[in-house]
Amino acid sequence: MRTDNSGSKHEGISFVLFDMASPGVTTRPIKLISGSSPFCETFFDNVKAYKSNLIGEEGKGWAIAKYLLTHEREMISGFGAAPKKSVGQMALETIGSDATGRLANGVLRQTIAQYQLDTMVFGATMARVGDEAKAGQGLGAASSIFKYYGTELNKRRNELNMAALGEQALGWDGDEYRGGVVSRDWLRSKGNSIEGGTSEVQLNIIAKRVLGLPDA
């Protein structure tokens, strides 16, 4: 919350905890196209916050918020990690293999191969930066790189799952229907590039703090 208006917009912000059940706090779920409601909008109408719940120093809340955002983005980037059942496995089960044992759809096979290579590189990079963080080096803008690329990988994975299932991704009643989960995951993945800071925000951070590009 803002406790001082005399400085810049990033100064004068304090990090204060408050009870979400406090009078004046209203939370409304936002229903996504997947049908779930993991997002919400919160309204504050004359809500009281107490100085005894101040975290850190007064006026230094922005630094705390940035620290938390760094770790939130790192967590969200994990959506791009390889799932238990790979895209290739699902495609083989659905489409089948050719005489050489490879996925019968050659175009989809190449696309999946590129995705899997990108996932391996992403995992290795995350492991390296994780070791650097354990050694005392801060994540810095790397969290924005991970958040952007990890969520884009997750969207690619869900797109490939949908492509592999084809018409089976459409819903019907019956015990053999698997497409419901896949299509819902695909729809839900669109929110990954919004939560924790949109992909556009992450690209701006990368441009300024990593590449040193000037403001537009």
Question: Model segments located where?
Answer:
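Glycine-rich beta->alpha junctions and the first turn(s) of the following alpha-helix
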Residues: G24-A124, N192
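A short core secondary-structure module
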Residues: M1-R28
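Tryptophan-centric aromatic hotspots in well-structured domains and transmembrane helices
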Residues: F15, F39, F43, W62-I64, ...
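Short glycine/proline-enriched turns and hinge-like loops at secondary-structure junctions
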Residues: K9-G12, S37, G56, T198-S199
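Glycine-rich phosphate/cofactor-binding loops in nucleotide/flavin-utilizing enzymes
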Residues: I64-E72, I76-S77, L165-A216
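Short, glycine-/Ser/Thr-/acidic-enriched flexible segments
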Residues: D4-S6, A21-P23, L32, K48-A49, ...
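C-terminal helix-coil-helix/basic helical segment that borders enzyme active sites and/or dimer interfaces
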Residues: A99-R109, M120-D175
